[in-house]
């Protein structure tokens, strides 16, 4: 009887298309109460080698051809059990066959079960030689997992490789509920290829068929297969009704693609979203090409543009070849500056202000590495399109440590800057930076003494337009040589907190750094790639005030700071606080008249920063940070958040973030000049929450309020209903989507999304709790 068991199990698995990804742990446990479990001891070993036990009221036979068992027939072998009113065993000699053909007929109240499936039906048949099996009018139920259904005839063929269902059905709903089901006139499951082919496929809600396809191919199991994924729909004020129907294409073992027709009612067309992934000897990468043939909204808003085609191309690649070659690509380009305002896309956002196009090839061996790269920017502002690209850039590093007590390094860079505008300055910059370090350390402290030379040469061209409009002139050839000296010392003190908190340990970590860089007037050098760096606590100990090499500020300063940490008895950090400052003995200058605070001639304690983290309990956490810069005359940035987190789906967070307009202007001068919504800085208070609100109902939401503008900045609300066989999600989002220069106010987009997930049939394609929170324009960040 065991010969027919794989048939039944394969049939169940073949049609199940089962996925548990969407089930939360508590819901899964509730659903498991509604499915049968295997209550007999599991038997190990090859089933064909195990004994067969047959119990029946009556038995008769005509050896060796036939045997008949009747009356409460109970046959057991290993973990398998077959019960029926009557079981007939037949054995016949076949012409040309070395062994006789052995078949089994089971009649009346046929019941089969093992540790994976239960089958009930009036009649069954099996060929024990070929393992071909037929089961008529069978009902099946998986054991220990959801999945059940029935078929007029279930057949097993090809040494258990193929399962064929005639008029078969499947649902993952618990017994007594047929909310949805999938039926087909014929279903063929190829276990080896892990694919199910369905003819005359009908999807039914209750007894009502709502979808039909003459042929459908669906992946089964973990093996990647081509086929349609679950569709999605939403409504937005930007595009009105939107519908997605993704198709997954398994091209080869090392490459695949997802092709998604995306219909947008207001745009009057279908955008084709094409994602391609690959893996090669040179690395792994992803390409995305989105294309909208025409856009009637864009035509109305931009009547002077020659084309209304909208597109995006994204390419990300990272790889190592032959252990020494490194290849990296980070490339994003769109058809027009309004693209990310009009279309949601995971590869860019309207708040970024620009898109990066970077290619790099690197070579690295012991003590040496070199990288050749090109970097361009596509600025989204229609008012200021000026941006510099590095075409190309060469970076070289050579290290030689343990030269006596010293570590040495030589860094070199050569780069050519090109502007998108023909009238802006351009330059070739060559930089050389030799460094020597003397590191000393023991168990409780360290001190590092460093000396370096910063030598830079500029060859600037195309200066006429700039020099004719500015009192400070740029020179064609500029040399800048600056020595730098730094001493950085750290200590770590530790004590047990037995009196206050037994088992806890506190550390005290003071740090002091002296930095000296002489002043060099850099007003004759145009600023190609420098901007003010953020001064959080760790940033206080940087060598540079500005990123890039065009502005290197003079320094005669001492940075001091202290960090204290508290660890519990499991060495988990429960609390830390850091406070530091920079004390300037002389003014930090570059000679650039465009940097307003250099005219104030300020010295003393100018920059303060502090960070803290407190893990109050396993469920409560608090983080915060503040940076005060007297050069900007105020608090530059600050942030804080407090969170209660019970698990992934139960959390509440309150947060606040602030950035002064002076800080934004100093760190992002080009973006600040066009980003009208940030002219008054950023001051936003927010709340994020996710929580089950009733039996099988849960809610997720986020709300941010701009205290400067006294209006909502962003909000999102999602509601989900989950059952054992389906889930429904409805989401609403209102987000900032640009600035109207004519009316001088922010533009918002409202979106309503709707998604259905079928438990046991679909993958988790819709928005889950974490996905919804992180898809927000102000994404959720964990405080714990």
From Swiss-Prot:
It comes from the Bacteria. It holds the Pfam family LptD_N. Contains two intramolecular disulfide bonds. Transmembrane segments: none annotated. It is found in: Cell outer membrane. GO terms for cellular component: cell outer membrane; transporter complex. GO terms for biological process: Gram-negative-bacterium-type cell outer membrane assembly; lipopolysaccharide transport. Keywords: Cell outer membrane, Disulfide bond, Membrane, Signal. Its main location: membrane. InterPro entries: LipoPS_assembly_LptD (IPR020889), LptD (IPR050218), LptD_C (IPR007543), OstA-like_N (IPR005653). Together with LptE, is involved in the assembly of lipopolysaccharide (LPS) at the surface of the outer membrane. Belongs to the LptD family. Component of the lipopolysaccharide transport and assembly complex. Interacts with LptE and LptA. NCBIfam families: PRK03761.1 (NF002997). This is LPS-assembly protein LptD. The gene is lptD.
